[in-house]
């Protein structure tokens, strides 16, 4: 486990060393694992992690369904709403389907339309790890949407090096540090040897140099 003060020091240094911009930049961490065989599926990480302070940037969410779930999606101001007809149409429009799959981070789908989603969008969403979360009828999706807006998804596949967004330069270093702390604790909790499987951690802004944390 990394001490919070050390995380804060690395975040502050990364922000200070980054070229000054007139716009907000993302802040990311890159984690390099060791002594772990990622060819074994049981060792791979596939986690959605709620950040205590959000990402500081907009997270694209798509809701698929009809009726009440559509009404709730509109109330929650999600970025894209698709009905069954649109899903089927995208099945015959591969370029547009790829754009949808890459443009939105999270997908929610009414349980009743999941077979159509699997058939027509599965080939685009599956490889990206973005198959929709099934939503049973009468479920209030608004708290789910709010949670996802403040979450990041880590999916390593068979790689030992992976990166994730942890915040933005519009946030305070303390807020970003809290987010990093939450991510590292979650990652270490699913590794067989915990922090002993972590070779290094670097933090950087989009345009700035990397600063070693671990």
UniProtKB/Swiss-Prot annotation:
MF terms (GO), sorted A to Z: rRNA binding; structural constituent of ribosome; tRNA binding
Origin superkingdom: Archaea
Keywords in alphabetical order: Repressor, Ribonucleoprotein, Ribosomal protein, RNA-binding, rRNA-binding, Translation regulation, tRNA-binding
Gene3D superfamilies: 3.30.190.20, 3.40.50.790
Pfam hit, one: Ribosomal_L1
GO cellular component: large ribosomal subunit
UniProt KW rRNA-binding keyword: yes
UniProt entry tagged with the keyword Ribonucleoprotein: yes
GO biological process: regulation of translation; translation
Self-association state and partner proteins as the record states: Part of the 50S ribosomal subunit.
Annotated family: Belongs to the universal ribosomal protein uL1 family.
Name recorded for this polypeptide: Large ribosomal subunit protein uL1
